[in-house]
Amino acid sequence: MALGRVGLAVGLWGLLWVGVVVVLANASPGRTITVGPRGNASNAAPSASPRNASAPRTTPTPPQPRKATKSKASTAKPAPPPKTGPPKTSSEPVRCNRHDPLARYGSRVQIRCRFPNSTRTESRLQIWRYATATDAEIGTAPSLEEVMVNVSAPPGGQLVYDSAPNRTDPHVIWAEGAGPGASPRLYSVVGPLGRQRLIIEELTLETQGMYYWVWGRTDRPSAYGTWVRVRVFRPPSLTIHPHAVLEGQPFKATCTAATYYPGNRAEFVWFEDGRRVFDPAQIHTQTQENPDGFSTVSTVTSAAVGGQGPPRTFTCQLTWHRDSVSFSRRNASGTASVLPRPTITMEFTGDHAVCTAGCVPEGVTFAWFLGDDSSPAEKVAVASQTSCGRPGTATIRSTLPVSYEQTEYICRLAGYPDGIPVLEHHGSHQPPPRDPTERQVIRAVEGAGIGVAVLVAVVLAGTAVVYLTHASSVRYRRLR
């Protein structure tokens, strides 16, 4: 009995463990059974049962780790914002192809604007121009692309175009080159009403500015309006002028950036014989505003002097900023020349003063001055001009008759390039005694003149006495 009970207990425990193993085996997620291709229920393969000898063989696959599935909310990328195309013309009351054109000085500019559907008989277009200051904000225009509704043209503008000129206020101010009878015409408007183009024939500092397009019916001319800003730019012209210097003078060169607009930064960088000049004390730059734009002049002075080495070559590099993002850069080079310092002498020979200058450039002449008179003396003669042994130079001589009234003489060289100091020589000479015969003649002439004057005075006095005597006698007779 005891042994039977023990055997029964062992059997039950064995069956329990077999059942647990079978349950765990069937519950394994990695165990799959492949039975041909998937299909409808009518095409499904028969069940895999050991009783069915013709059943297909099952192929177990190794267990695969489960893949963690992410929620769509965590993996989905944010959708890009929908692309918005240009607004349809039909939904906009005004649309211009360019609201802020920038064009070169002297170019021809066209601006096209489209307005609501209308007919010629009931619509009216006006275009007004407003001047803008240099580098100023838009001013009266709140936004270049904003459509103004029921807003009249602000005061202070000049009328450029009116599609109904017979309705134009007679007190309106037309812009130069616009209006009836304007010649030459600076503005023209072409195209059908509602799809018109404004043509600025020549863009200048005077024709740039803010243009206000105002559109409406004849009985409501300010229904819609829009602003267009027209800006002009003009690159600078660059020239370099290396100064001619005398021996002993420092080398110099001047660069000029002329007639550019707008007047943003124009920066110069100087190079002397290929080496940059960093000392600000050697560079002087000045900007000036002119009616046709701006001009900047920059001058560099070298530490080297003429005659102590070869001539210097200067290069100026100009960087002009058209706006905050655009700039242009140009270079100009030139070599300074050295002129010999002339020797000037003065001597008095007889009745003439003679001035001589050696080794002066061709084309240089003398100018004479006497005493404190700032006007050159008239009687000047160049006696001779000979070579002095240096190419392009000569020795010149000038003579001047001596003066009987002045004692101070100045002979000055004229015709040197700009920047050369005044070169002159001062001399003194006492007036020579006059010839005795000449003195006698002068005295005789002076005596004759005095005698004639006395005679004329006597004749006039006698005539006056006779006239007064005759007048008194006539009056006496009338009284009797």
From Swiss-Prot:
Bias-annotated ranges (Low complexity): 37-58
Coiled-coil blocks: none
Keyword Thylakoid annotated: no
SUPFAM superfamilies from the UniProt entry: Immunoglobulin (SSF48726)
Transmembrane regions listed in the UniProt entry: 448-468
Domain Ig-like, residue spans: 236-328
UniProt name for this protein: Envelope glycoprotein C
